[in-house]
């Protein structure tokens, strides 16, 4: 007689093993109809699964996050059902859930086309309209093998070989179609109406380019059509903001096949890059950092000492010269330790904060490259703080404060923090880890910031804090990192003389705020849709004459602004003023200055914003002061 305890503490007693669906029915017909699955003693199970013991039960519906994940997973199986009906010779591979959607990898004799995707989606809708039950059968291993052998599903057989310890497996039947899965899945296709197939891409079996190529059909699914419509609107907005499209339209940068994963910065984009670098340089100088520059090509001996050669060599670009092996640095840390090691340090010299705008290269897979967001050549706002154990908390707190200030200057207020603690495999004593984790937690708490704890997610050499930004579309971007390291100073012989005149290894704090300049600029482009705040805009003001008579004064205004440290340019083309205003509005120049005869006479400019707001006519000096205030506000003006 199982006693079922529900989330509100109420209990229900049954005189026989009972399914999740039956428990839901005993509560109410409405809940039974909405039941997707259950969570028994904290474990997700199918609605049809029996409970034969006293247990806690949470009914899972589409309103729950787990319910939406189950809907997405079941939609992937529905893709399989539709594909096998339309293309019977296709071989189904795997169909997992991903962030906000799902995909299915498929082997087929020809590439799918957009028309094929439309046909698959239409067939899926027809199958949903049949309102059929999805039937789960736990099946002995040998029978599972026979099922997929008889259907010619070679990839499923290979996946079964990967699970030698599984004696029985869940088979889920969508009418005549069958798929293998741990589940759970929806009990009926009526839950799958709010879906859409989104794109096609290539993939490889087991993710290895040496293996056979597959086709990947992506889709998204939601609890209801309202959520689906909101998602589609968000995706359309994100496409409008795609940094690759805006990068071309605003003449910021380009990439090309001859240099995959490398960025060709154009004058406009390089201006943004330089403003970013100059800003970070000033911020770091004000906060006690010493800027250094280290080599890009370093002998493998150093990478062997640091451990990178053994653990990271496949991601490093290497070369050989005069019988010596070299690597282009994928990160700056070992080189920074070399600078620290020049001369024995005293505890009085700590903390020592070494910063570098370090150019790094990593041999990322070509399929992973994405505009300037995921590249092979990038520059980090990298710094390493060498300090004593006693200084860990103060240095961490100072960095957290600095990071929040920097993000606010770029217009980001919604910051998410995660604290990752010790993994099972690690270096350093338990006491050292205790102190390090306590230092990071105390630093976060002293800043009054909420954070998510991620037990076991730290690196083997120390705990870390991750800083993520939420942009205007609600997307979360992990950018900043504060990583404590007990390992590298030991491996590379970094020492200092303590107060007791003993040699000790410093703690090393790896830290970055932006992450990489390239990716951060990509985030800024998409966040602002290319309409950078005045302080970042490649051109802050454009001066336009109405006729040739005002050309000389327009050039004088340009000189005045540029000599004042601003970025202004003239547009003296013999075009209608409306045409010029529209063109520079599309180029997202913050301020558009129009000069006619009256402005020449009064030594003034008529000022418009790119949003079309008429700020009126004002003396040049007044505009200069207004622009100076806008630049000084940085991105914080977007928060007011």
Curated annotation (Swiss-Prot):
- What is the protein name for this chain? Threonine--tRNA ligase
What is this protein's function per UniProt?
Catalyzes the attachment of threonine to tRNA(Thr) in a two-step reaction: L-threonine is first activated by ATP to form Thr-AMP and then transferred to the acceptor end of tRNA(Thr). Also edits incorrectly charged L-seryl-tRNA(Thr).
Region annotated Catalytic, chain positions: 242-533
Q: Which SMART domains match?
A: tRNA_SAD (SM00863)
Q: State the InterPro entries in the record.
A: aa-tRNA-synt_IIb (IPR002314), aa-tRNA-synth_II (IPR006195), aa-tRNA-synth_II/BPL/LPL (IPR045864), Anticodon-bd (IPR004154), Anticodon-bd_dom_sf (IPR036621), Beta-grasp_dom_sf (IPR012675), TGS (IPR004095), TGS-like (IPR012676)
UniProt source species = Azotobacter vinelandii (strain DJ / ATCC BAA-1303)
Location in the cell: Cytoplasm
Which biological process terms from the Gene Ontology are attached to this UniProt entry? Answer: threonyl-tRNA aminoacylation
- Cross-referenced Pfam families, in alphabetical order? HGTP_anticodon, TGS, tRNA-synt_2b, tRNA_SAD
Q: What is its EC number?
A: 6.1.1.3
**The encoding gene:** thrS
Sorted alphabetically, the Gene Ontology cellular component annotations on this record are: cytosol
User: What cofactor is this protein dependent on?
Assistant: Zn(2+)
Query: Cofactor note, please?
Result: Binds 1 zinc ion per subunit.
Q: Which residues bind Zn(2+)?
A: 333, 384, 510
């Amino acid at each position: 007689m199982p006693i079922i305890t529900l989330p509100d503490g109420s209990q229900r007693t049954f005189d026989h093993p009972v399914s999740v669906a039956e428990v839901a029915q005993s509560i109410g017909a409405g809940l039974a109809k909405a039941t997707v699955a259950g969570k028994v003693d904290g474990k997700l199970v199918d609605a049809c699964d029996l409970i034969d013991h006293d247990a806690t039960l949470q009914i899972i519906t589409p309103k729950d996050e787990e319910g939406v994940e189950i809907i997405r997973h079941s939609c992937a199986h529905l893709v399989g059902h539709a594909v096998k009906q339309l293309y019977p010779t296709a071989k189904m591979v795997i169909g997992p859930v991903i962030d906000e959607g799902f995909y299915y990898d498929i082997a087929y004799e020809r590439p799918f086309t957009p028309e094929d995707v439309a046909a698959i989606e239409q067939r899926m809708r027809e199958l949903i309209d049949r309102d059929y039950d999805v039937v789960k059968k736990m099946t002995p291993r040998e029978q599972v093998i026979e099922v997929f052998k008889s259907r010619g599903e070679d990839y499923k057989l290979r996946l079964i070989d990967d699970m030698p310890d599984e004696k029985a497996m869940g088979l889920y039947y969508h009418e005549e179609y069958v798929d293998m899965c741990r589940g759970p899945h929806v009990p009926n296709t009526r839950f799958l109406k709010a879906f859409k197939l989104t794109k096609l891409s290539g993939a490889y079996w087991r993710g290895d380019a040496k293996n056979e190529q597959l086709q990947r059909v992506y889709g998204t699914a939601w609890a209801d059509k309202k959520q689906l419509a909101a998602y589609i609107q968000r995706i359309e907005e994100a496409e409008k903001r795609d940094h690759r499209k805006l990068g071309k339209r605003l003449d910021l940068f380009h990439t090309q096949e001859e240099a995959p994963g490398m960025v060709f910065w154009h004058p406009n984009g390089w201006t943004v890059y330089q403003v970013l670098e100059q800003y970070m340089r000033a911020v770091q100088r004000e906060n006690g950092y010493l800027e250094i520059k280290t080599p890009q090509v370093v002998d493998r001996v150093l990478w062997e000492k640091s451990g990178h050669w053994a653990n990271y060599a496949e991601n490093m670009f290497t070369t050989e010269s005069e019988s010596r092996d070299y690597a282009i640095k994928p990160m700056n840390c070992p080189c920074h330790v070399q600078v620290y090691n020049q001369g024995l340090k005293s505890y009085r010299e700590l903390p020592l904060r070494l910063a570098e705008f370090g150019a790094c290269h990593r041999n990322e897979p070509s399929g992973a490259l994405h505009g300037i967001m995921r590249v092979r050549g990038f520059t980090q706002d990298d710094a390493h703080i060498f300090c004593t154990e006693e200084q860990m908390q103060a240095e961490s707190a100072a960095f957290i404060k600095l990071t929040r200030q920097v993000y606010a200057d770029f217009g980001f207020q919604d910051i998410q923090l995660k604290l990752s603690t010790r993994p099972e495999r690690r270096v350093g004593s338990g006491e050292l880890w205790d102190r390090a984790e306590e230092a990071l937690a105390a630093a976060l708490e002293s800043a009054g910031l909420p954070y998510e704890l991620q037990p076991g997610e730290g690196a083997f050499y120390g705990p870390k804090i991750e800083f993520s930004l939420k942009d205007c579309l609600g997307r979360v971007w992990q950018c900043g990192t504060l990583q404590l390291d007990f390992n590298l100073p030991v491996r590379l012989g970094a020492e200092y003389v303590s107060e007791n005149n003993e040699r000790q290894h410093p703690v090393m704090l790896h830290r970055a705020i932006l992450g990489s300049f390239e990716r951060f600029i990509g985030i800024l482009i998409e966040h602002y849709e290319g309409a950078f705040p005045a302080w970042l805009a490649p051109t802050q003001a454009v001066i336009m004459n109405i006729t040739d008579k005002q050309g000389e004064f327009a050039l004088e205004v340009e000189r005045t602004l540029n000599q004042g440290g601003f970025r202004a340019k003239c547009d003296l083309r013999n075009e209608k003023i409306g045409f010029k205003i529209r063109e520079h509005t599309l180029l997202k120049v913050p301020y558009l200055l129009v000069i006619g005869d009256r402005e020449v006479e009064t030594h003034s400019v008529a000022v418009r914003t790119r949003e079309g707001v008429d700020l009126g006519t004002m003396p040049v000096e007044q505009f200069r002061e207004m622009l100076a205030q806008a630049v000084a506000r940085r991105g914080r003006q977007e928060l007011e």
